[in-house]
Structures are given as structure tokens and as C-alpha cells.
Curated annotation (Swiss-Prot):
Source organism phylogeny: Bacteria, Pseudomonadati, Pseudomonadota, Gammaproteobacteria, environmental samples
Gene3D superfamilies for the chain: 3.30.420.40
Protein name as annotated: Anhydro-N-acetylmuramic acid kinase
Molecular function GO terms recorded: ATP binding; kinase activity; phosphotransferase activity, alcohol group as acceptor
Alphabetized UniProt keyword annotations: ATP-binding, Carbohydrate metabolism, Kinase, Nucleotide-binding, Transferase
Length: 364
């Protein structure tokens, strides 16, 4: 009997690639195959404009929603071909969609993702699970982070509490202590502002290994101003997005400084946001496991390590690819949805359970 396979396809706040994980799930979670496909530059620029420009038209929104649906479909079909996994063994594909707006502090909070699941269902022939975040919000959560329960399943170790720190465009972490308890929160900017500065001012996608930042000096005045943001005063659990942490948050005077000093300060901002949250929440005496694209920014990891009182490892040191963790989480959430198993949703007052994700299929 062939293994049942669950696919997770993830594009994060950096909108630079679609990461695709193939999981088999039994007593353990096993990554059968991982594939990553870069966003076409033209589409990445369209998404960037849609996120940053409040005056984008409904026509633009509708068109890009379809384009990303086709990109997800093409990427998933390509990954299946490379994996040599039989399509008949695939139970579902869970897609994150591309987040273009995440606004929680409103009377009617919402999180908006694009990437039409109807197209993905039609083009792949698979059952699609999507739109996880809005049921999370409906149940009293913030729609992010979604991954704490998966982190618990993957990284739990008896008598050894862990912080699972995901550094994407936005940083979030899960506190893994008890098998049946979850705790997680967004903590602030990860790569979002760093990458935006590199793209807009240096015409490079990112500062590889943090090499430019490592040569600079911290502007403590700007850093102090950034750390006064009201987001950091909110109680956890909380969520945020590029609506808040983007290039516009930086002062005009600061943007006139040398590139290495700007990037050095932004690394410090990301690192301090993370460490301040860990300390504030009393999670000091446990290991930190880092995953996400920011794990490859050596200077950022170095600064986190120097500020922390915790031992630090990369998820890859534990056998889990730093780039694969989030798409693995979506595959696992897809598995839970098609199995009609509720997920734990963390709210400001208590944890509740609910079915996350909408199911779309193009045939019986």
C-alpha cells in the first residue's frame, strides 16, 4: 500500500518564492520531498505594488489573484514531476495564498490572501485546502501565526522547552513546552524592511549573509525610535505584517546614511525585537531553534546569539531544512483539515479548537 502524501505550498511575506513540501504522516512527520520555485520578477513587482499601493484597482487585484493561482498550479505540478511521487497517492494540497493585507486592529479584522484555489484545483486535479487564516480570526485568533501547533508536533522534546523562531518577512516564535499546550506570537520585522531597502535602494534582492550590514554601525537614535512602535506595547499573542513594518517606517534623515549603517541598524532592530519579546514573555531559559529565510543571514543570527541567554541552533541542525518548515506546516494543516481534525487556535483569553481551511475540488 502506497503512502498517503500531503502537499503544502507556501509563499510568505517576502513574496520571493513558492516553497513546496511533500509529507507522509504517521507516528512521525516525514518530509518526502521539498521543492522551491522563484517568483517571476514581473509578478513579484506586481504583488509588491499591490501591497504597497492603497490605490491599486479591483481589476489589478482580480487579475493578480488569477495569475498567482496559475503560478501555484504550475509550481505544484512541476514539483510533483520532479518528486516522482504518483499523483494518485496525494490526498490534498494546502496552499497559503499570497498575503496582501493583514489588518487585525479593526472593528472587522481580516487577513487577505490571493491565489485562486479554484484554479489550483482545476489545473492540478487535486483537492485544495486554502484560506486558513480567516477561520482562525473568526474563532478569536489573529490569523497569525498559524504554526505553533505544528511546531509542537515537530520539535517537542520532553523536559526540554524550546523556542521555535521563524524569521521570514515577519518574525514569529512558538514556545514548545507541553505536548498538549501551544503558545506563539509575531514579534516584529524579520527580513521585510532589510529586503525592501536592498531592493529599493541597492537594486539587489537581499544582503547575502548580512555581509553589508556586518560592516556598518548602529544608529542608536533611529533604533530607539523604531523600538518605541506601539506594536511592541501590545500583549501577546499578536500579529503584524508589512502594512506596519515596511520602508515607510524609516525616517528620511536615516535613509541618507551609508547603506552598511542602515542595514546594520535594521539587523539590530530585527534582533532586538525578537530578544525583547522572548525576555518579556519569560522564555529565557530554553534553546532557540531558528528556521525561515532569515536563518541564512549569518550576521542576524550572530546578533541574536550575542543578545540571547539561550543556546541557539538552526532547524537544519536537527534534520529539518530551514526553508521547508512553513510549507511543511501547511501540508500538516491540510492533513488535519481533510481528516476533519480540529486545530488549536490561540486567543487573547484562552485556546479554542476549530476546523481551519476551506476545501475546493474540481471533480467528484
Amino acid at each position: 500500500m502506497s503512502k498517503k502524501i500531503y502537499i503544502g505550498a507556501m509563499t510568505g511575506t517576502s513574496h520571493d518564492a513558492i516553497d513546496i513540501s511533500f509529507l507522509s504522516i504517521g507516528t512521525k512527520i516525514h518530509l518526502e520531498y521539498f521543492h522551491s520555485i522563484k517568483f517571476p520578477k514581473s509578478l513579484r513587482l506586481k504583488v509588491k505594488k499591490l501591497i504597497e499601493n492603497n490605490e491599486s484597482s479591483l481589476s489589478d487585484l482580480g487579475t493578480i489573484n488569477k495569475e498567482i493561482g496559475f503560478l501555484f498550479s504550475k509550481s505544484i505540478n512541476e514539483a510533483i514531476g520532479f518528486s516522482k511521487i504518483k499523483k494518485s497517492s496525494i490526498e490534498c494540497v494546502a496552499i497559503s495564498g499570497q498575503t496582501i493585507r493583514h489588518e487585525i486592529n479593526k472593528r472587522f479584522p481580516f487577513s487577505m490572501q490571493i491565489g485562486d484555489p479554484n484554479i489550483v484545483a482545476k489545473e492540478t486535479g487535486l483537492l485544495v485546502v486554502s484560506d486558513f487564516r480567516n477561520m482562525h480570526i473568526a474563532l478569536g485568533g489573529e490569523g497569525a501565526p498559524l504554526v505553533p501547533e505544528f511546531h509542537n508536533q515537530l520539535f517537542y522534546k520532553a523536559r526540554n522547552p524550546r523556542i521555535i523562531l521563524n524569521i521570514g518577512g515577519i518574525s514569529n516564535y512558538s514556545f514548545v513546552k507541553n505536548r498538549n499546550d501551544i503558545w506563539g506570537t509575531d514579534v516584529g520585522p524579520g527580513n521585510a524592511i532589510l529586503d525592501a531597502y536592498c531592493s529599493d535602494f541597492l537594486q539587489i534582492p537581499f544582503d547575502k549573509n548580512g555581509a553589508i550590514a556586518a560592516k556598518g554601525k548602529v544608529d542608536h537614535i533611529e533604533l530607539g525610535r523604531l523600538l518605541q512602535n506601539n506594536f511592541f506595547k501590545r500583549k501577546c499573542p499578536k500579529s503584524t505584517g508589512k502594512e506596519l513594518f515596511n520602508i515607510k517606517i524609516l525616517s528620511k534623515k536615516f535613509l541618507k546614511k551609508k547603506a552598511e549603517d542602515i542595514l546594520c541598524t535594521l539587523v539590530e532592530f530585527s534582533a532586538k525585537s525578537i530578544i525583547n519579546s522572548i525576555h518579556k514573555n519569560g522564555h529565557n531559559n530554553c534553546d532557540i531553534v531558528i528556521c525561515g529565510g532569515g536563518a541564512h543571514n549569518k550576521y542576524l543570527v550572530k546578533r541574536i546569539s550575542e543578545m540571547a541567554s539561550n543556546d541557539i541552533v538552526l532547524s537544519s541542525d536537527l534534520g529539518h531544512d530551514v526553508f521547508a518548515i512553513e510549507s511543511m506546516a501547511f501540508a500538516w494543516m491540510g492533513y488535519k483539515r481533510v481528516s476533519n481534525e480540529a486545530l488549536i487556535v490561540q486567543t487573547s483569553s484562552k485556546n479554542v479548537k476549530g476546523l481551519l481551511g476551506s476545501i475546493t475540488k474540481s471533480k467528484l
